[in-house]
């Protein structure tokens, strides 16, 4: 036990030094500072029954990305005279022991909107309050406090981007520096009998490492996040003209987006700092794009989804979710596995799914294609099943955003133009006319035919083609009624889809 005033900084997300108000407050006036990260078995313990390497909740790529982020955080803390203390176990039990043994007077951690952390944080705060420990839990993972937006809207979250932007206005911190740069931190006090460890390796956690070819090319950590952001911001013309949903989902050498989403997910990069950097570019160019399509607009989309997710009970499911259409999706696990394991027989779809498995990341338009294909576009499989696959495999998997995107792309919420389908053929033909992207992830295909899947593809992916033959090419009248639409509205679309499938699967 250390004498003097001791603070504990509990890292979960927010794995950074810059713009970290919880860390700044923990350091202020403290003789000793304990920066802690808990290896939570809920997220990190290997699951031998999962369909891919990883834990019950996360694939190996995301676990590796997190570990890299922790190593980088530890190095950055050491530069300030501190270090990261890694402990293992159920987080609340670990924290209770640390708070007591280290005689902590101040507990600081970033506010988190996810239901899992809401329940965990309430448990920890109850214990800390009873022990007379000061608690500081600021909102710094998002641009705005979701609770403030919901309060402004009469107690319910806004359900359109436009209404959210109108309610949110300009962030209060936007016109002034968001934080002072830390130059030092209080030392770590005595850790007593608490079992402290270094940041574990993949092997330490009980996993077998994968070949280089099966690892994500994106390295975790604040240092890499800032490097990537500055590289993107340096191209002022690109920032000024950024316009989503434009972009090339087949780009391999240099992705057509910033690829900052995993760094924002883990808080290696502050969304507030990124926002200010974009603003600075916009102030120094003659013209630029505007929300919702601009780069700044993408950060606002992120906050919009966080706000809706935070204010909507059962947001991550169809049942008892008041904003989700109750659609009679198929619970066909054979079709799900064919999609998940890249065995649909559609080269464009399968190549994207292999990219997901290997990289843990895909361009947003690629995500749209495969999500639409699984749900309303072709297979009519429940969006929750696709959501679970993305949640496991994406390195940027974010509870609020992942669920929101699946609700959107399945036309279950936010977006209801059911007949706007991403064709598994023409979309690939448009963006990958020479088949370079497809052959990169499906090298066994020597020739890529976008109009008719090649015989070679049919032979290799025969199982998936047998599954696809069970489809009738259209949604039933009952299914369309559940969407609040008339069958005749989609007659042409259905006929076209049916002819296309019959051609492909004959």
Model features per residue range: what roles?
Residues 154-325, 428, 432-506:
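Glycine/tryptophan-enriched, flexible segments
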Residues 98, 108, 127, 136, ...:
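Generic recognition of cysteine residues
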Residues 22, 69, 73, 225-232, ...:
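Alpha-helical packing segments of well-folded alpha/beta enzyme cores
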Residues 112, 411, 444:
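Short, loop-centered acidic/histidine patches that primarily coordinate divalent metals
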Residues 253-439:
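Active-site-proximal binding-pocket segments
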Residues 55-62, 66, 218, 341, ...:
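Residue-level preference for long, well-ordered alpha-helices that form the structural scaffold
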Residues 1-183, 291, 354, 389, ...:
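Trp/Phe/Arg-rich N-terminal binding region typifying the photolyase-homology
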């Amino acid at each position: 036990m250390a004498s003097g005033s001791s603070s504990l900084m509990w890292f979960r997300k927010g794995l950074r030094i810059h713009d970290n108000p919880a860390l700044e407050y923990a350091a202020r006036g403290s003789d000793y500072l304990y920066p802690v990260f808990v290896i939570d078995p809920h997220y990190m313990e290997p699951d031998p029954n999962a369909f891919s390497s990883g834990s019950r909740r996360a694939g190996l790529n995301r676990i590796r990305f997190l570990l890299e982020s922790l190593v980088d955080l530890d190095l950055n803390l050491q530069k300030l005279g501190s270090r990261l203390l890694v402990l293992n176990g159920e987080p609340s039990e670990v924290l209770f022991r640390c708070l007591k043994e280290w005689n902590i007077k101040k507990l600081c951690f970033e506010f988190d909107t996810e239901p899992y952390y809401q329940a965990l944080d309430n448990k920890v705060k109850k214990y800390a309050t009873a022990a007379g420990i000061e608690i500081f839990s600021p909102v710094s993972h998002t641009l705005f406090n979701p609770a403030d937006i919901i309060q402004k809207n009469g107690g319910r979250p806004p359900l359109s981007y436009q209404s959210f932007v109108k309610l949110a206005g300009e962030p209060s911190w936007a016109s002034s520096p968001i934080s002072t740069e830390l130059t030092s931190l209080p030392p770590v006090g005595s850790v007593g009998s608490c079992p402290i460890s270094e940041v574990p390796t993949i092997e330490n956690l009980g996993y077998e490492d994968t070949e280089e070819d099966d690892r994500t090319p994106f390295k975790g950590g604040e240092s890499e996040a800032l490097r990537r952001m500055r590289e993107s911001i340096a191209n002022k013309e690109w920032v000024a003209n950024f316009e989503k949903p434009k972009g090339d989902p087949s780009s391999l050498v240099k992705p057509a987006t910033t690829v900052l989403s995993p760094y924002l997910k883990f808080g290696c990069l502050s969304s507030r700092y990124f926002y200010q950097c974009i603003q600075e570019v916009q102030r120094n160019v003659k013209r630029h794009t505007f929300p919702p399509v601009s780069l700044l607009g993408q950060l606002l989309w992120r906050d919009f989804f966080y706000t809706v997710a935070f204010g909507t009970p059962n947001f991550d499911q169809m049942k008892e979710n008041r904003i989700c259409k109750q659609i009679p999706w198929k619970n066909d696990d054979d079709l799900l596995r064919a999609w998940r394991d890249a065995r649909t027989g559609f080269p464009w779809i399968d190549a994207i799914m292999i990219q997901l498995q290997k990289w843990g990341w895909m361009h947003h338009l690629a995500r749209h294609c495969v999500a639409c294909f699984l749900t309303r576009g072709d297979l009519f499989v429940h969006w929750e099943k696709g959501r679970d696959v993305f949640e496991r495999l994406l390195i940027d998997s974010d509870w609020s955003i992942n669920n929101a995107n699946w609700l959107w792309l399945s036309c279950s919420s936010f977006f209801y133009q059911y007949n706007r389908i991403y064709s598994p053929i023409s979309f690939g033909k448009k963006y990958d006319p020479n088949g370079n992207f497809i052959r990169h992830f499906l090298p066994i295909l020597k020739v890529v035919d976008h109009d008719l899947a090649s015989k070679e593809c049919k032979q290799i992916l025969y199982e998936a083609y047998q599954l696809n033959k069970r489809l009738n090419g259209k949604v039933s009248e009952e299914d369309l009624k559940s969407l609040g639409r008339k069958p005749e509205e989609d007659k042409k679309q259905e006929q076209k889809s049916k002819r296309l499938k019959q051609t492909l699967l004959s």
